[in-house]
Amino acid sequence: MVSAVYHPLADGTVREFRDYVAPDKAVIERLFGEKLAPGIYEENREDVAQGITEEQLAHCWPALRQIIATIPTPAALDSAYATIGAVSRLSEIGIDEEKAPELLRYAPLVRHRLTLLRLLPCFVME
């Protein structure tokens, strides 16, 4: 799924960059519920992306685009998954495909990692 997000991003559709802003606690509670939200808060207590600025992103963007170019395309991944018999669609694991954008937006909160997925809200697309 992320390959299908990263490649169009790197293909020149970024119009501007924004400073990173951590997700609002109310949004986390709505998405993860009362039971899971405390663990998500703890996981993100020291947000790995905090302090990343639009200037830093703009400066690093050419290098990030080169890295993205090394990621297999969605078609290549689909072919590989089919070859090994792996699932490749949310619907194959019982999740509605329409939930993909929201899942991609909030998936980075589950683990304390700095990924491009966590920074997606910093990219303003054309």
Task: Indicate residue ranges for each PLM-predicted region.
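Mg2+-dependent prenyl diphosphate-binding active-site environment of isoprenoid biosynthetic enzymes
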Residues: M1
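C-terminal charged capping/lid subdomain of soluble metabolic enzymes
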Residues: V5-E126
